[in-house]
A protein has these predicted regions:
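Short, solvent-exposed loop/turn segments at the edges of secondary structure
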Residues: 69, 89, 131, 162, ...
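A short core secondary-structure module
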Residues: 151, 155, 210-233
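Acidic/His- and Gly-rich active-site-bordering loop/insert found
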Residues: 1-106, 123-132
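Acidic/histidine-rich catalytic neighborhood of metal-dependent amide-processing enzymes
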Residues: 101, 107-187
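Short amphipathic alpha-helices in soluble, non-transmembrane regions
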Residues: 215, 325-333
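A common structural junction motif
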Residues: 78-79, 228-233, 330-338
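Flexible glycine/proline-rich, aromatic-decorated loop/lid segments
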Residues: 170-171, 182-197, 399-409
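An extended, acidic, His-containing surface patch that forms the Zn2+-binding/catalytic region
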Residues: 52-56, 62, 67, 174-175, ...
């Protein structure tokens, strides 16, 4: 390990050791302020150059530039999800082993936050002054409701600030992102599906389990969930961003896939049928999805519930939208005498132009730091803080400059989250490019 990589690994390890777990409606932000104190100690030069503002644990920093031109905003959140299960190394130990750094947040997204501020700090140490203002933003509750980012977005709107470009977490650099694509791709999110939580409630008079009768609340919910799995209530379509993604990945495919994906409109019916079985991620880009995540019924082994419910996490597509997607599933639920309750309304972010100058700046940064890597737009199926920034910029993109494996991708929100040590320095170099060229 070279000296630069060693220093970087030790720094990120310290950040991983701060257990900034995000919890719903958590008023105590002490752990986040302790984390920010560590950031100040680690990156003194950039903190000295910036105006720092606290937003109840989330923060916004402004680095004054030379001109009055539109600024850019770089983002990565501080909070992480919980880390249950049997990990190879303790999830908040920041263990460096096997040429990797292990721990919750290495990829999502303390790694990105560290690389962003490390790049800025190194530039600040040379007395570099950016051409335009650069803002840095970090939310403390991205993993729950994103209210920190929403609050900052609202304040930026009040101030009349519009960003030339916003760059947040998102796609990464992966080999063969879709089966058959033999190249290495940087997947840049140009939009994200909306998210809404729904509660499906089935009721009855209850009773004793010895005489259950038919169509109890749990049975009806089971039939309903099975019907959702089998139904086609959510419309599949290939949006322009996905068309462009298919064309990009087809470049490294062999025939006949190369020709089929290279002409997605011509082969649209075939692709709509085949893609979900080839790639679950690509399949989720084609339509609204509904995943059942929580459930509750009776508290007794021999008691029929008077009320049972399941929670469904819906990610609605741009072409079907929230209102139409909810209406479709509500209509299906009614067939099983199930009430649909919208717990938290959401919104889909607009799709940013992948032919724009800001996108090309990202693409140029990728090709400069990662030679041979192909840049492709895609639609994020998950949610990020970036969705709130579509209110202050027409060019919101989602990309984390780390080269990872499929196994590492699966470790995000799962067991043994880790990052290769060799991925650290290029990430810093990419952020330097963005700060000097955007």
């Amino acid at each position: 390990m070279d000296n630069r990589t060693n220093i970087y690994a030790q720094q990120l390890s310290k950040l991983i050791q701060c257990e900034t777990i995000s919890c719903d409606h958590q008023p105590d932000k002490t752990k986040f302020y302790e984390f920010q104190k560590l950031l100040r100690q680690m990156f003194p030069a950039i903190f000295e150059k910036c105006i720092f503002e606290d937003f109840h644990g989330s923060f916004l920093m402004k680095w004054q530039g030379k001109s009055e031109a539109a600024p850019i905003l770089l983002m990565n959140h501080q909070d992480v999800v919980e880390a249950p299960g049997a990990w190879k190394y303790p999830p908040f130990s920041g263990t460096i082993a096997d040429r990797k750094l292990w721990g919750r947040g290495t990829l999502d997204t303390k790694g990105g936050l560290w690389a962003m501020l490390q790049a800025a700090n190194e530039l600040a140490e040379t007395d570099f002054v950016p051409q335009n203002d650069i803002y840095f933003m970090s939310g403390c509750n991205e993993e729950t409701d994103g209210s920190g980012a929403e609050e900052i977005s609202a304040e930026l709107q009040k101030r009349g600030i519009r960003f030339k470009m916003v760059l947040d977490e998102g796609g990464m650099i992966m080999h063969e992102p879709i089966g058959g694509a033999s190249g290495t791709y940087a997947m840049v999110g140009v939009g994200e599906k909306g998210c809404v939580d729904l509660k499906f409630v089935a009721r009855s008079t209850g009773g004793h389990a010895a005489t259950p009768g038919k169509d109890t609340p749990l049975v009806r919910l089971g039939k309903f969930m099975a019907a959702v799995e089998k139904s086609s209530i959510f419309k599949a379509d290939i949006t322009p961003a996905v068309v462009q993604m298919f064309k990009k990945v087809s470049a490294t495919m062999k025939q006949p896939l190369k020709f089929v994906l290279g002409h997605p409109i011509l082969f649209k019916p075939l692709l709509l049928k085949v893609i979900p079985s080839v790639s679950a991620t690509a399949g989720a880009m084609l339509k609204t999805t509904l995943a059942f995540t929580m459930a509750s019924a009776s508290e007794g082994f021999n008691v029929l519930p008077q009320e049972a419910w399941v929670i469904g996490n819906m990610r609605f597509s741009h072409h079907q939208g929230e209102k139409e997607s909810i209406h479709a599933v509500k209509k299906l639920a009614a067939k099983f005498d199930i009430e649909t309750v919208v717990l938290e309304p959401g919104f889909a972010s607009p799709v940013s132009d992948y032919n724009s100058e800001p996108f090309h700046t990202i693409e140029n940064g990728i090709s400069t730091v990662f030679p041979g890597v192909i840049t492709s737009p895609y639609v994020m199926t998950g949610a990020s803080d970036c969705r709130f920034m579509s209110r202050v910029s027409d060019h919101c993109f989602r990309f984390a400059p780390f080269q990872i494996t499929d196994k590492q991708m699966d470790s995000i929100h799962g067991l043994d989250e880790n990052i290769d040590l060799k991925a650290l320095a290029p990430a810093v170099d990419f952020y330097k490019y963005m700060m000097t060229e955007a």
